């Protein structure tokens, strides 16, 4: 679950710096619950769309600053693999999505990539058409088992 979507759908698309802290805290609770469910069900993998690195980039990109809580959680979280989607497909409005400008999308891609590299986190770039992306993601995930 992506808590930000639920929040913005419920309360409106206007948000501020402190709103992002609330969203991050709720998202972190959902991630913990999802992890526990995956462990209890003996699943090898579980998938998270929005985690604390996303929240960190969102805060820094929009507000030029980030809450200490988000940074601390981002540094402590552990995931086996990040799937970093390259912005080489058309942007599609979904009612909540921001940054239709290609330059901003590329800038954000490089921002995420630089953080992943700086923290030496395992990631793969998912690019190409919609049809090409899913097999690439599946292949990358299959290397984990």
List each model region and its residues.
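Conserved substrate/cofactor phosphate-moiety recognition/catalytic segment
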Residues: 1-28, 32
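Basic, glycine-rich
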Residues: 126, 130-145
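Alpha-helical elements of Rossmann-like donor-binding domains used by nucleotide-donor carbohydrate transfer enzymes
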Residues: 22, 26-29, 111, 136, ...
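Active-site flanking residues adjacent to catalytic metal/cofactor-binding acidic residues
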Residues: 1, 48-50, 85
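A glycine- and Lys/Arg-enriched "phosphate-lid" helix/loop adjacent to the NTP-binding pocket
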Residues: 62-132
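Glycine-rich phosphate-binding loop used to anchor ATP phosphates in small-molecule kinases
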Residues: 21-78
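Short, basic/glycine-rich phosphate-binding loops at helix/coil junctions
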Residues: 7-10, 51-56, 87-93
